[in-house]
Amino acid sequence: MVVKLSCIENAKEFCKIVSSSQYKDIDIDLQCGRYVIDAKSLLGILSVDLRKQMKLVFHGEKNDEIRLKKEIEKFLIDE
């Protein structure tokens, strides 16, 4: 999945979704160039250029990934 957050408000909303209790035991990362960032860390997300596309790497069950994809649909972009 590829996401683009564009602004601080979108980054906050995205971080709130991936940090929710249903994903608390699942590692979710964002890859931006050579950097890999914990997607649950707002500070980490804000440390990269929000104008760039980031690859979301989900380390969990497929059904959880499908649920997350629906929740973050507005941040997803075509690859």
Kindly give the residue locations of the regions a language model identified.
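Short amphipathic
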Residues: M1-S6
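Conserved beta-strand core positions
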Residues: I26-I28, M54
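C-terminal structural segments of small proteins and small subunits
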Residues: D49-E79
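Short, glycine-/small-residue-enriched flexible loop/hinge segments at domain edges that mediate gating
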Residues: D29-R34
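Amphipathic alpha-helical interaction surfaces in cytosolic regulatory modules
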Residues: N10-K24, Y35-L50, E65-E71
